[in-house]
A protein has these predicted regions:
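An N-terminal alpha-helical hairpin/helix-loop-helix interaction module that forms a charged
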Residues: 13, 142-257, 273-350
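Short helix-capping/hinge SLiMs at alpha-helix to coil transitions
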Residues: 58-62, 272-274
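DNA major-groove recognition helices of helix-turn-helix
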Residues: 70, 81-95
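Phospho-regulated, low-complexity intrinsically disordered regions of nuclear gene-regulatory
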Residues: 107-147
Length: 350
């Protein structure tokens, strides 16, 4: 069904959506799904300025703010942000070609396409008008940020291989391969001399418990690897046990018992590289910042990191181009999409 507008152009018949005004709040429902927003974000035809503008709002507290408050936090020009959001809304509306948002005066409204609502702010506020991103767009941006990491990683790996001499990350695959079918003590003995742990302090402590508290330590590692128990509880129990059995006599300067989450992650990864991957707090903190998520307290960071990596893992598992790209470097070693996911985060954030 078609109709002609006054200026003579022919358009597909589309829904006219009226703006809802409730006091100072302006809103409307446009029915654009998360999947549609994600497709638009991935589309190379969508201006990078539009994507950057949307992501700036995403990074604002609770994904809302005025142009001034957002730019004060993220940088940039408030007028440019306003312009890009408006132009983005116009672009999306034309791209989808199924609705028009109309103001009470009959004029089109474009900023409401990406925004769930907007409201006037009281005097002396940081700005005069506040936006709130649509929930479907928020979820799409979360997925897009993961997808974008994989795309950046593929571009990088086309130039620098995993086993490149100047930036060699192959040792991680070599380590998990060497640990296959080894007993727990042998695995820890290999882990303790790698940079996956804080070697100067952790390595001597692990060496001590292996040689002088072997039975107790082996039992502690067995409990740590028991997947029937929640990871946070296992880490807590391992930490407590290690403070008891790794207390080196006559060492009043000892302040690390090889029970930190980084050490735990390295041990677990080498025991089961398809269930765990390596962790470092600095990397975890950067990932949280990138995803606009608050880090957890000590003792819960590693389990949180493992949760945050799951969406990335799903993309990695289903990306044939990525696997074909890294295969020449790692095909002779134990395969772990979790380790590949960790490598993506490591090379892009550290």
């Amino acid at each position: 069904v078609y109709f002609k507008c006054r200026i003579g152009r022919i358009y597909n018949a589309m829904e006219k959506i009226e703006v809802i005004q409730e006091g100072a709040v302006t809103s409307c429902n446009i029915g654009v799904s998360k999947e549609e927003w994600l497709e638009l974000l991935k589309d190379s035809a969508t201006s990078k300025h539009y994507k950057e503008a949307l992501i700036k709002v995403f990074y604002a507290p609770q994904h809302r703010g005025s142009c001034i408050s957002i730019c004060n936090k993220m940088g940039g020009n408030p007028q440019s942000l306003n312009s890009y959001i408006t132009k983005c809304g116009e672009y999306v509306q034309k791209k989808l070609n199924r609705f028009q948002i109309i103001r009470p005066n009959g004029e089109p409204c474009y900023w409401l396409v990406p925004m769930a609502e907007g409201k006037d702010l009281p005097k002396n506020s940081e700005g005069t008008f506040e936006w709130q991103l649509r929930p479907e767009l928020i979820e799409a941006i979360k997925e897009y940020l993961y997808w974008h990491l994989v795309e950046c990683y593929k571009s990088l790996r086309k130039e620098i291989r995993i086993d490149d001499d100047k930036w060699n990350e192959l040792y991680k695959w070599q380590l998990i391969t060497e640990c296959q079918d080894k007993d727990l003590i042998s695995i820890v003995n290999k882990v303790r001399v790698t940079n996956l742990v804080y070697t100067p302090l952790v390595s001597p402590t692990l060496d001590f418990v292996i040689n002088y508290r072997r039975k107790e330590f082996e039992k502690a590692v067995q409990s740590l690897a028991d997947r029937q128990v929640l990871l946070d509880k296992r880490i807590q129990d391992f930490s407590t046990t290690m403070q008891e059995i790794a207390d080196v006599p006559d060492n009043d300067k000892q302040n690390l018992y090889a029970n930190d989450e980084r050490t735990v992650s390295a041990i677990l990864t080498c025991i089961d590289p398809n269930a765990y991957t390596t962790y470092k707090y600095g990397l975890y903190k950067s990932v949280c910042q990138y995803l606009n998520i608050q880090p957890k307290k000590a003792g819960k960071c590693y389990s949180h990191f493992m949760e945050l990596i799951k969406p990335l893992l799903y993309i990695v598992e289903n990306d044939k181009e990525l696997h074909d790209l890294v295969a020449p470097s790692i095909s002779n070693y134990v395969q772990s999409d979790l380790l590949l996911s960790q490598d993506i985060l490591w090379v892009l954030f550290v």
